[in-house]
Amino acid sequence: MIIRKNESDHRSPYALYVLGSLPDENVKSAAIVGARNCTSYGEQMALQYGKCLGHAGVQVISGMARGIDGAGQRGALNGDGTTFAVLGCGVDVCYPRENIGLYMDIQKKGGNHIGISTRNEPLARNFPMRNRIISGLAEWILVIEAKEKSGSLITADFALDQGKDVYALPGPVTSALSQGCHETDPAGSGNTDHTGRTDG
């Protein structure tokens, strides 16, 4: 149901644990994902896009990871918006610990945390499932900085498989952190410029 409205996708998780409530299906939602070890440019773009989406009343979905994910969610809060963190660990576990301030702010400002377990530390096997939940909850995905092989592109692939739009923010052609964005499958996806317009 919430993971995908298309009945052809049957690989749903056993259960979701939610601290609060799930995103409102009657309100637009978008995911912002990208590199953990992002550049200052990527971080500023994530903050800017997150703030614009939050200000526009769009629910921002992400994984509360360091780097792009966390910056996009901080931006949403700065825009007086609502953001939801999908965690690859217990819903009551803050990971990474450095984002404890963001973890608390999300709850204070009306957002919530969604986990695939309770009281579990993050495990590598949890993150592909976490990425799929992110794409399932969002209507479209924005990728800001991603290497050629990254979890962010896994999220983008899930979204494309679900028939959703994927947008990638271009960066310097010499940057390894932008290579994944430049090579994002153009089928159902597009590039976006700094004004938020798309060419896809």
Pin down the residues of each PLM region.
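Glycine-biased, small-residue-rich flexible motifs in mid-sequence functional cores and linkers
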Residues: 1-200
